[in-house]
Each structure stands twice: as structure tokens, then as C-alpha cells.
């Protein structure tokens, strides 16, 4: 699924007044905490409030991980989680801590020594490898 297309459509609906800011700026407090503390900054400005800079937060879910997943604080920690022998699913979410906008940007499998894990490891949705 191309999450950016869905995102852009949702932003247009907000701009047209068909969807309210409160409908889309409803990030969970834990997601906002992760955004402030471990989010990877992007160069993009929030499409909703035009004030905040967006950050990317990654959550990793899989066997032998906490039920709420793990939110790696560094790229090295993310890479270590993605090299696990057990398969994991990674979710990259863009977040604006200023207005609580959030949107899933990418979901990909990793771990389990899959070809997809090697292909996806450390790449951002549109900017290539994460550094």
C-alpha cells in the first residue's frame, strides 16, 4: 500500500474542511513521547499546523518483544532488531509533536533472515537509506 497517497488525500480533506484538525491530530501520548525523545528528524514541516517539524518514529513488533512493540532510539538499535532470527514487522510513523498529527508512512517485514529484511533494513519511505 502506498501510504503517502493516502496521507496526501487526508491532508487535502483537512484543507477542504471535510475533516477537522481534531480528527487527525490525535496521536496517543506514548507516540508523542517517542516522537519527542527518539524520533528521527525530517526536513518536512507538518502539513496540518505548518509549525512543527515532522519526525519519524519506528515501532518494531514480533515474537519475544513486548506486547506494545519496541521503539528503537537509534538506527543501530533498529538494525539490531531487524537482524533478529525471529521475523518482525516494522512500522514507520511520521509525527508532529506540536499538533499531534501522525500518519503511518511505511510498514515492512524484517528479521527472520528474509530477503525483505536485507532489502528494507534502514531505508526511509522516500529518502533512501537511514543514516
Segments from the language model and where they lie:
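N-terminal pre-domain and mature-chain start segments
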Residues: 1-88, 101-131
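Helix-rich interaction surfaces within compact, conserved domain-sized segments
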Residues: 90-98
